[in-house]
Regions:
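C-terminal accessory/tail domains of diverse enzymes
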Residues: 1-37, 50-191
Length: 191
């Protein structure tokens, strides 16, 4: 690799601790090759959505939308709000429209672009939900924490949704260690 080469790295499906171990090795190799990331890069995480029912879909979208202002705080400025063409905000979509959707197709119609922080269009092709907000990184710590955050949010969405205006310290699906990690990220990225 030299400084003129750009590429997109796509992993195979990774699952559980074994998947995280493989990811850690890849991050180590990328770092040892002096791979550099810039503001045009994004980390896109696909999570299995094959077994989602409509309640889980609605709760997930409402939770992400209601948490978006807090999530924005621990993302770089280039990934906040609607500042990035490739990961649009969910804020402008009315809660009632999300709640009234009867199936995934209706939700996909409400969120027709794949260039959203939460991409529902991925479901039709891959049976996944894609999260596009995170900035590009080769830091295993950042990726692991983000994947765990998303996994816990999805698990929570199977039973409920976050209320509007919720603060990071009140996210019920995060443990104290992960809350501390994101508080430190927020402080580091404060504008």
């Amino acid at each position: 690799l030299n400084g003129n080469d750009t590429f997109e790295l796509v992993s195979p499906i990774l699952e559980g601790e074994g998947g995280l171990e493989k990811l850690e090795r890849v991050c180590w190799v990328l770092d040892s090759c002096n791979v550099k990331i810039n503001g045009s890069c994004g980390l896109h995480v696909h999570m299995n959505a094959e077994d989602f029912n409509i309640t889980t879909w609605r709760n997930l979208l409402l939770s992400y939308k209601h948490a978006e202002a807090e999530i924005d705080k621990f993302m770089p400025a280039s990934r906040r709000g609607s500042s990035n063409t490739y990961c649009g905000s969910l804020i402008q979509f009315p809660d009632e429209r999300i709640r009234s959707a009867r199936n995934i197709r209706e939700l996909q119609g409400l969120f027709p672009s794949r260039y959203m922080k939460v991409n529902l269009q991925a479901y039709s092709r891959h049976r996944t939900v894609e999260f596009r907000q995170h900035s590009g990184t080769i830091s295993f710590t950042k990726i692991e924490n983000w994947v765990c955050f998303l996994d816990r949010m999805i698990t929570f969405a199977s039973v409920g949704s976050l209320p509007a205006g919720i603060r990071l310290e009140d996210f019920p699906f995060l443990g104290e260690k992960q809350k501390l990690y994101y508080k430190l990220r927020t402080k580091k990225l404060a504008v």
